[in-house]
């Protein structure tokens, strides 16, 4: 069972990730061990549990770098993660950010799937209110046919961009996020071959049963995932203070569905890997700066 996704902000060295067998961490990842790990944290004891590890790739474009070079590094990162035994690679959806290349997760997955063999690939995530659930079902149904048993579909309701891009370029209306629960159910119906619309089927997509993961950083996502009986991926890489509350609620209120009889939790955390502590600290500082640049400066090179 998967325990967590690591939000790895890539360094210029494409293979700057740690071996799953030796990773030490002080954040909870294993869903079945969360309670015990939380107790250790409160007692001040170090946590060194093993977990299935994954990577969330923003596909950063560094200063002086081209989008093509960023894509090439993403391919190398996925290949190295596969060699090291990581469970999956997920790709984000952001728009109008000059330092983030990942605007179309499905296209990236299609490309990187052809360059890898086993590692699972998915979206972390598709911002569903930006899209038609039907089109997303077709896209990820296509990916599942190309790479069977390797595709994940993480969905969120955030815009993934600024308000100007949201309203004018993406043409997303102000109330689209309010339809997120219904959009998730509609999307799932297409993938299960049980379309809500008579005579309409996702081809490809129907009966592929691509697993849907609800992404969130608040109680809203936890509540929705529990109600629908879907896996839950919590964004503790930017909202760590809510991790325990959200995952505990999700597990306690989980309603089994046809596909998932038990709750399934993924926790996103920030990890910086390097050969020495000093190098890791320096890389961490660069990561913090890049995050400010991407989100506060809309990806401009500040």
Which residues fall in each region the model found?
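Intrinsic low-complexity, disordered N-terminal segments enriched in polar/charged/small residues
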Residues: 3-7, 27
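A conserved active-site cap/scaffold subdomain adjacent to cofactor or substrate pockets
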Residues: 226-234, 238
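Hydrophobic faces of well-ordered beta-strands that scaffold small-molecule active sites
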Residues: 53-57, 89-91, 121-123, 151-155, ...
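Acidic (Asp/Glu)-rich catalytic clusters
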Residues: 48, 109-117, 144-150, 226, ...
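N-terminal beta1-alpha1-beta2 module of alpha/beta enzyme domains
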Residues: 37-121
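An alpha-helical appendage that flanks or caps ligand/catalytic pockets
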Residues: 38-49, 167, 173-202, 241-302
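Flexible, glycine-rich active-site loops centered on histidine and acidic residues
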Residues: 49-67, 129-192, 232, 240
């Amino acid at each position: 069972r998967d325990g967590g996704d690591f939000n790895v902000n890539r360094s210029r060295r494409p293979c700057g990730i740690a071996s799953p067998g030796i990773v030490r961490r002080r954040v909870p990842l294993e869903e079945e061990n969360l309670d015990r790990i939380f107790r250790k944290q409160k007692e001040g004891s170090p946590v060194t549990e093993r977990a299935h590890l994954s990577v969330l790739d923003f596909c950063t474009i560094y200063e002086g770098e081209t989008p093509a070079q960023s894509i090439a590094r993403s391919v190398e990162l996925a290949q190295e993660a596969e060699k090291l035994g990581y469970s999956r690679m997920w790709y984000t959806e952001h728009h109008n950010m000059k330092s983030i290349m990942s605007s179309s997760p499905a296209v990236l997955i299609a490309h990187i799937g052809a360059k890898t063999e086993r590692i699972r690939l998915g979206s972390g995530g598709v911002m569903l209110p930006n899209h038609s659930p039907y089109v997303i079902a077709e896209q990820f149904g296509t990916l599942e046919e190309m790479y069977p048993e390797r595709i994940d579909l993480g969905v969120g309701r955030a815009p993934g961009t600024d308000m100007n891009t949201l309203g004018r370029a993406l043409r997303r209306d102000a109330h689209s996020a309010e339809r997120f629960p219904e959009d998730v159910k509609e999307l799932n119906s297409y993938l299960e071959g049980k379309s809500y619309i008579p005579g309409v089927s996702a081809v490809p997509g129907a009966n592929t049963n691509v697993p849907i993961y609800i992404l969130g950083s608040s109680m809203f996502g936890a509540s929705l995932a529990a109600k629908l009986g879907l896996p839950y991926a919590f964004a503790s890489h930017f909202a760590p203070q809510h991790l325990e509350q959200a995952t505990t609620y999700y597990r306690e209120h989980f309603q089994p569905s046809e596909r998932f009889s038990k709750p399934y939790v993924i926790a996103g955390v920030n990890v910086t890997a390097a050969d020495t502590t000093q190098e890791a600290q320096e890389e961490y500082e660069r990561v913090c700066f890049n995050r400010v640049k991407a989100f506060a400066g809309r990806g401009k090179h500040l």
